[in-house]
Amino acid sequence: MERRTLLVVLLVCSCVVAAAAEASPSRWPSPGRPRPFPGRPKPIFRPRPCNCYAPPCPCDRWRH
């Protein structure tokens, strides 16, 4: 029973340390918005604005 309690305590402590390390402001440039991957931030998909000057406009197909 003592061994199981020790394992639970170690597991909880490791989770607390991991959460504290992720939320530390020294690791991230902006502490309010942590990034999931420190080396490569996930790119945000933004559709390009479409400027059509000709009648057969390809943007009409993209807009729903």
Swiss-Prot record:
Function text: Antimicrobial peptide that has a large activity spectrum with activity against Gram-positive, Gram-negative bacteria, as well as against fungi. Shows activity at micromolar concentrations. Displays minimal inhibitory concentration (MIC) values lower than minimal bactericidal concentrations (MBC). Synthetic peptides with similar activities than the full length peptide (composed of the first 23 or 25 amino acids (Arasin 1(26-48) or Arasin 1(26-50))) may have a dual mode of action depending on the peptide concentrations.
Upper lineage: Eukaryota, Metazoa, Ecdysozoa, Arthropoda, Crustacea
Record's protein name: Arasin 1
Keyword Signal: yes
Record text on subunit structure and interactions: Interacts with chitin through the N-terminal region (26-48). This interaction may be important, since chitin is a component of the fungal cell wall, as well as of the crab exoskeleton (permitting a possible action of arasin in wound healing in case of lesions).
Species of provenance: Hyas araneus (Atlantic lyre crab)
Gene Ontology BP terms: defense response to bacterium; defense response to fungus; immune system process; killing of cells of another organism
Reported modifications of this chain: Disulfide bonds are important for activity especially against Gram-negative bacteria, since the linearization of the peptide causes a strong decrease of activity on these bacteria.
Region of interest (Cystein-containing C-terminal region important for stability but not essential for antimicrobial activity), residue spans: 49-62
